[in-house]
Amino acid sequence: MRSDVPFLDPDSLTTPFAHLSDPRTDGETVRIALLSDTHVAVDGEATPRKAFHRTGELLERAVEDANGRDVDRLVLAGDLTKDGHPDEFALFEERVEGADAPLLAVPGNHDVPKENDDHETPPLSRFARRYAPGLPFRHRVGPVDLIGLNSAETPDGVLSGVHHGQVSTDQLDWLDRTLGRAETPLVVVHHNPLSLPQVADRAADWPWHVYRHADPTSFLRLLDDHDVPLLITGHQHVPSLRHENGLTQVIAPALASYPLSYLLVEIGVRGTDLTLVPVGMTGDLTESYENAAAGEAHHRAMLSYTDETLRSLPF
């Protein structure tokens, strides 16, 4: 067992991820459990990238842990399911049934219909009804404006056969109007508009550019125009943080991948504290780490970046 990896230590319950000066509130602290890439599978096997065989159990543990932290909301940054099968959505709902806090989610590319599906994936409209107050959405949590966007599907269907994402023009218009009224915005979307060159440089066999936001310029300009301090994304399965032009982009850890964790986001008078909360047992973490280490070059590149990130926390 790799005892030098912090999350293989059963006594390591949480790890500070980052402290940001903004967003902040005038008094009330808002506490959010931010999960991403849960990839719930009904009949799944372990792969170098995802612990499909443990996803339901990991999600249930995360919900129980979040309940114990008295969070105000449970927020998911996309890819709730393995491949959007109705049975996977049913299992997801079963595993989050015990959540004390209200749940909100944005869709990931694995949650929407795709051209190569061998099953009938529920339409985006159902996702918006069941897991959000519509899409896009603005949801007030105390003094915080939680803003959720859909980057997994566009009206023209251009994303139906790919894994990258895009925020549609209609959503950008809505976002421009909405941010003009938001006092303390926290924006959540599945696909990350800022790239991860640290990972791409390590894996020549992995086309990272096709897995990000396809046309990020207008989106990033809009966030900059409204001085949005924090954007939380998922999708890449590598916990990271990047600053650019006043914006901090956080890629949340994937619950289905090493280090089998979620983020606790606490927004208060002194700014925002992000804490990494692992929910995998020691054996789960060891297995997840070793599966990634035995994978292809891009799996090992993701693992090495994640490993270095964990060792150097907080950002």
Describe these PLM feature segments:
Residues 1-89:
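N-terminal active-site segment of His-dependent metallophosphoesterases
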Residues 34-36, 73-79, 103-109, 187-190, ...:
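Active-site neighborhood of phospho(di)ester-bond hydrolases with catalytic His/Asp-centered motifs
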Residues 33-57, 112-130, 155-167, 203-208, ...:
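Acidic/histidine-rich helix-loop elements
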Residues 41-42, 81-87, 107-117, 153-159, ...:
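Active-site environment of divalent metal-dependent phosphoester hydrolases
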Residues 97, 200-280:
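Conserved beta-sheet core of the metallophosphoesterase superfamily
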Residues 21-34, 138-148, 180-186, 243-249, ...:
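Beta-strand-turn-beta hairpins that frame and shape the catalytic cleft
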Residues 5-24, 86-181, 222-224, 264:
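Extended active-site neighborhood of metal-dependent phosphoesterases/phosphodiesterases
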Residues 1-18, 27-28, 269-315:
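A short C-terminal boundary segment appended to hydrolase-like catalytic domains
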